[in-house]
């Protein structure tokens, strides 16, 4: 193979594909120059003046850019299967992605990770998995699986496994949890990258966290936080997703202070499928950076070579001889609309059309198994008249919540007025019968219920409603379809979106899935869900007991400031 690549490089043999008359974006020297790109055997054989090839494509001055890299994402957050998610990424020029499948791991453990590896691994892009490090995320809820260091040892050498996923257990790292240290030791001994997750961790605690072997962080929300992490030796992944949008705040500081960008890269973390379809992922980050005043070639560094170097990906991320022929052709560097996308010298978009999605095994399609329940499970009789109860107060446009209270004797009238709603989390993995029951305000639903099996991070069944009867209907509908979203009016099901894989993802085509998501959300808003509240996504975060101030899990109402359950 290399003999032929050398012959093409020397001009003695025709290339497989010749990209003629292009402008090469060189992220190694931050320059742009006119050249042809000769591709042979899946790699770039030469960049310069070439004439011979099996296929010649005249670019007419278009820009040849290294394939873009998404340094950190969660495929499951799109609710699309890996094949359909990857196809959307490729449409916008991403040829390498690094995913942390901790959502499906919390439901199905190693079986879920194997599915993600198989499904994504057949796609025409570089698809890497960082093994989830925190399954479950906390001890305050029941997940479908528990993964310790011994489980990770069994997976670490699987094809496609790159490093360790985000280490969310910051106290466990800083204060030397034995189990956390075993995980860190495993990946450090193999020379693998360890992703961090350190929101608002500063000072000496940050130093201890980084000194333990953490390599990256994607949780900075300000330039000052990002700068401190850079000074402590972390690679900072600049996040621009659907809910968490931190790029502008960080890059304004980078541009204003003129700092070196070698340890900066772009990622999305969580991004909705409709947003990806509309604007892409990393391409959107590059466009935003350029609009903020960053030079286009420098912005593209944060989307290509920087990511590759941070994660140790050899010969990926630049347009140079001997490097993998992962390339994107753009007409211009303003609109950044891909004209062609190549992976290992193959037209990646055409290659996508030939791929059939993997059929998940039966265990991944039958994961909603709560113990028996009825309307009585959600009844007002669980609340005593003479007691004060905490109420989760939702905030429009935020996943943070506030705390309020209500006397038990006032709950029935508040429900009738729509001032509060009932909320419950049913353990759905092992049939334990655990049910957390509580109260919530600020959602706005009228006469019915909403339920979902997407409930971060353990993904139990969460339901909110105006009556126990409506909640019972909604929860039973999700058991019937084995996971997804559902909306009930009165006690009749209005609409259901099945998420047939672990209650997290749909095997429906992307366009169909986007339409279904938009439709059920619109119906929920028409039924009273307030503006600024996503009927399902906002609800899914009410079960995550690591975000202030008040949450609910299958074990009960949880005060995240005191880090304890409310008895």
Task: State each model region's role.
Residues 1-35, 39-40, 49-50, 90-92, ...:
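Active-site microenvironment of metallo-dependent hydrolases
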Residues 18, 67-69, 129, 266, ...:
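Residue-level marker for buried hydrophobic side chains located in beta-strands
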Residues 5-8, 83-194, 257-259, 494-498:
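Divalent-metal coordination cores built from histidine and acidic residues
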Residues 22, 42, 61, 72, ...:
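Divalent metal-coordination and catalytic microenvironments
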Residues 112, 146-166, 172-238, 245-266, ...:
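Histidine/acidic residue-rich metal-binding segments in metalloenzymes
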């Amino acid at each position: 193979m290399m003999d032929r690549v050398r012959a093409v490089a020397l001009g003695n043999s025709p290339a497989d594909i010749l990209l003629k008359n292009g402008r090469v974006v060189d992220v190694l020297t931050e320059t742009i120059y006119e050249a042809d790109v000769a591709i042979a055997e899946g790699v770039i054989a030469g960049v310069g003046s070439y004439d011979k090839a099996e296929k010649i494509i005249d670019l007419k001055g278009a820009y040849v850019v290294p394939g873009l890299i998404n340094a950190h994402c969660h495929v499951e957050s799109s609710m699309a299967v890996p094949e359909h998610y990857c196809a959307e990424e490729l449409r916008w020029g991403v040829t390498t992605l690094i995913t942390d499948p901790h959502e499906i791991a919390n439901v199905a453990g190693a079986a879920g990770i194997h599915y993600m590896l198989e499904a994504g691994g057949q796609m025409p892009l570089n698809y890497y998995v960082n093994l989830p490090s925190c399954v479950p995320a906390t001890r305050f809820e029941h997940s479908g699986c528990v993964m310790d260091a011994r489980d990770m040892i069994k997976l670490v050498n699987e094809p496609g496994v790159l490093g360790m996923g985000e280490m969310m257990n910051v106290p466990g790292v800083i204060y030397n949890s034995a189990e956390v240290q075993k995980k860190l030791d495993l990946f450090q001994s193999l020379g693998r990258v360890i992703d961090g997750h350190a929101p608002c961790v500063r000072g000496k605690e940050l130093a201890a966290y980084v000194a333990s072997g953490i390599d990256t962080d994607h949780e900075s929300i300000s330039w000052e936080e990002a700068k401190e992490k850079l000074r402590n030796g972390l690679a900072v992944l600049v996040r621009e997703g659907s809910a968490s949008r931190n790029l502008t705040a960080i890059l304004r500081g980078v541009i204003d202070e003129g700092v070196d960008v070698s340890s900066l890269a772009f990622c999305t973390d969580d991004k909705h499928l409709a947003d990806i379809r509309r604007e892409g992922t990393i391409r959107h980050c590059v466009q935003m950076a350029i609009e903020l005043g960053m030079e286009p070639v420098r912005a593209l560094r944060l989307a290509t070579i920087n990511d590759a170097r941070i994660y140790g990906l050899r010969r990926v991320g630049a347009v140079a001889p001997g490097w993998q022929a992962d390339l994107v052709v753009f007409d211009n560097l303003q609109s950044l609309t891909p004209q062609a996308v190549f992976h290992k010298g193959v037209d990646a978009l055409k290659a996508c059309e030939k791929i059939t999605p993997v059929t998940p095994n039966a265990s991944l399609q039958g994961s909603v198994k709560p113990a028996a329940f009825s309307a009585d499970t959600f009844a007002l009789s669980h609340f005593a008249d003479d007691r004060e109860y905490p109420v989760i107060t939702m905030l429009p446009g935020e996943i943070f919540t506030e705390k309020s209270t209500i006397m038990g004797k006032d709950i029935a009238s508040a429900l009738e007025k729509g001032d509060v709603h009932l909320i419950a989390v049913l353990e759905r993995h092992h049939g334990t019968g655990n049910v957390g029951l509580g109260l919530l305000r600020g959602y706005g639903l009228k006469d019915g219920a909403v339920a979902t099996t997407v409930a971060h991070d353990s993904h139990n069944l969460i339901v909110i409603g105006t009556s126990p009867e409506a909640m019972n209907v909604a929860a039973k509908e999700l058991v019937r379809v084995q996971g997804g979203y559902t909306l009930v009016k009165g006690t009749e099901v209005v609409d259901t979106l099945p998420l047939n894989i672990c209650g997290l993802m749909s095997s429906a085509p992307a366009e169909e899935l986007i339409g279904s998501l938009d439709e059920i959300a619109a119906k929920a808003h028409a039924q009273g869900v307030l503006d600024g509240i996503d009927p399902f996504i906002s609800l899914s975060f009410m079960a995550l007991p690591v975000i202030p101030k008040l949450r609910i899990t299958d074990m009960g109402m949880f005060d995240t400031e005191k880090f304890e359950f409310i008895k």
